Amino acid sequence: VTSYTLNEVVPLKDVVPEWVRIGFSATTGAEFAAHEVLSWSFHSELGGTSGSQK
């Protein structure tokens, strides 16, 4: 069994619009294979001006 790991930090605000959907896709060509996402992490911070909200 061969195992591969992909780890990448991407500043999404620089490459995608404000509203976006993220998905995964994989292929091996003509052969059958199973692809599993074993771990997924997402962190988001709201930007904007400081001050009280009404």
UniProtKB/Swiss-Prot annotation:
The record's InterPro entries line, in alphabetical order, gives:
ConA-like_dom_sf, Lectin_LegA_CS, Legume_lectin_dom
Q: Does the keyword field hold Nucleotidyltransferase?
A: no
Q: Does the keyword tRNA-binding apply?
A: no
Annotated signal sequence is none
Q: Which GO terms describe its molecular function?
A: carbohydrate binding
One Pfam entry name? Lectin_legB
Which domain of life does the protein's organism represent?
Answer: Eukaryota
Q: Which UniProt keywords apply?
A: Lectin
Family per record = Belongs to the leguminous lectin family.
The annotated subunit structure for this chain is:
Tetramer of two alpha and two beta chains.
- This chain's protein is named Lectin alpha chain
